Amino acid sequence: KPNFAPSGLLAAATNTVKNADGTSTLLKYNEPPEARKPLVGWRLYVFKGDEQLELLHIQRQSAYLIGRDRTVADIPLEHPSCSKQHAVIQYRLVQQKDEFGGSKAVIKPFVIDLESTNGTHVNGEAIPTSRYYELKASDVLKFGTSNREYVLLHDEVS
C-alpha cells in the first residue's frame, strides 16, 4: 500500500549544500517569503579593540550567513566560541507606520541567531535565539565570546 505522507526528503535536499570534497552540509536557515535585497548600501565595519580589521559591503544579497563553516558562511568567523552556522543577517520587507497613521513597505535588516552555543549580542545585549531582531544603523554585533565587533552602517549614515 503506497504511503503518500510527507517524508521530509525533498525539504532536506533543498537545504543541502554539496561541498567540493563530496560531503554535504545541511543548512540551518531558509529565507522567508518577505526576503528582499536592500535598496541602500549597508556595511559592516569589523573591529578588534580600536583597530578596524575590514569593511564588508552587505547589500548584494538578501541574507548573509555568519559562522565558522567556510563552505556555507558568507561572513566567516574564526573564533572557536562561534558556531559553524551562528547567525544570519536577513533583509525583510516589513510594513512601517508613517507620521500620518498610514503604512508603507520598507526593507530593514534583521539578525537571527541560529541556536548558537554562545549566542549573538546586539549593543551588549544577548538576543533571543531563532527570532528575528531588528537592526538599526550604528548597532554593534558580537558573536559568541569573540572580541570582534561588527558595526552596522548604511550610506545615509557616516
Regions found by a protein language model. Give the residues of each.
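Forkhead-associated
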Residues: 61-140, 144
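Eukaryotic regulatory low-complexity N-terminal regions enriched in Ser/Thr, Pro, acidic
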Residues: 142-143, 148-154
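Intrinsically disordered, low-complexity acidic Ser/Thr-rich regulatory segments
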Residues: 1-80, 93-99, 154-158
